[in-house]
Swiss-Prot record:
A GO cellular component annotation in the UniProt record: cytosol
Gene: pdxY
Transmembrane regions listed in the UniProt entry: none
BP GO annotations: pyridoxal 5'-phosphate salvage
Keyword vocabulary terms for this entry: ATP-binding, Kinase, Magnesium, Nucleotide-binding, Transferase
Annotated source species: Actinobacillus pleuropneumoniae serotype 7 (strain AP76)
Subunit-level organization: Homodimer.
ATP-binding found in the keyword field: yes
Signal peptide extent: none
Name under which the protein is recorded: Pyridoxal kinase PdxY
Length: 286
């Protein structure tokens, strides 16, 4: 069994961060060591919440604790998502290096959550800069959305072709694999949900339905990053992992849309996470 150290947010109510990613990864047969960067009552897009940001020292101390009982070498991957403070970025990078020293084959997937004030996604000052200047260079895989793609590449990215160029730029900055979780308004079709996956071997594009919500569910990117990493650890090829992830997330979104509920319906869609009924295919475009 593969093991993922998942360092991201926790919400008591609803689905975001580790709450959105842990159960789906476990469904795929991967053990998840969840380390929470924050503990909030609910995700920040409600506009109000209670809770705490975990002290930055907690990350290193918890890693040390796992190491001291001789289990850290069993960690196959580190996944980072929503980060509670700029100082935590450094701690997460250090944690990955510690894991890597115990298991040289371990990989790091960075989901570079930078915040989106227009949508109510709020992150602490300095987190964006830390992700760009520190985490990206150490990540084997990075999973930006459109906002994060612009920040990581330093390009404006106003159309499909510029998105391709931005992905190519990121591949020169450290990551070996880039999964763009949502092309948003720079996609080819306004009525579709479109994604990219890129390596040195090329760029693949996948398109699936875009569901309409009164309020967009939160935690979709966390679910996407977790499923992609779990699929890779389970031995799927890059493209198999990309397709399974896109299809499983599509099915979760369809179930959620049909439910009329704001929060992701991960439990209700559990069978489709394991075996997606959707069968959208990735097409190589570069």
């Amino acid at each position: 069994m593969k093991n993922i150290l998942s360092i991201q947010s926790h919400v008591v109510y609803g689905y975001a961060g580790n709450k959105s990613a842990t159960f789906p990864m476990q469904l795929l047969g991967v053990d998840v060591w969840a380390l929470n960067t924050v503990q909030f009552s609910n995700h920040t897009q409600y506009g109000k919440w209670k809770g705490i940001v975990m002290p930055k020292e907690q990350i290193g101390e918890i890693i040390q604790g796992i190491d001291e009982i001789g289990e850290l070498a069993k960690c196959d991957a580190v996944l980072s998502g929503y980060i509670g403070s700029a100082e935590q970025v450094t701690e997460i990078v250090n944690a990955f290096h510690t894991v890597k020293s115990r298991n040289p084959n371990a990989i790091y997937l960075c989901d570079p959550v930078m915040g989106h004030p227009d949508k109510g996604c709020i992150v602490a000052d300095g987190v964006k800069e830390g992700l760009i200047k520190q985490a990206m260079a150490h990540a084997d895989i990075i999973t930006p959305n459109l906002v994060e793609l612009r920040e990581l590449s330093g390009l404006s990215v106003e159309n499909f072709e510029q998105a391709i160029e931005a992905v190519k730029v990121i591949l020169t900055k450290g990551p070996k694999k880039v999964l763009v979780k949502h092309l948003s308004k720079v996609g080819k079709q306004a009525d579709k949900f479109e994604m990219f996956f890129a390596t040195e071997e090329g760029i693949w594009h996948i398109s699936r339905p875009l569901y309409q919500f009164d309020k967009e569910p939160v935690g979709v990117g966390d679910l996407t990053a977790g499923l992609f990493l779990a699929n890779l650890l389970n031995g799927k090829s890059d493209i198999e992992a990309f397709e399974h992830t896109a299809n499983a997330v599509n099915d979760v979104m369809e179930v959620t849309a049909n439910s009329g509920v704001y929060e992701l319906q991960i439990i209700a869609a559990r069978e489709f996470i394991l075996t997606p009924r959707s069968q959208y295919k990735a097409i190589k475009i570069v």
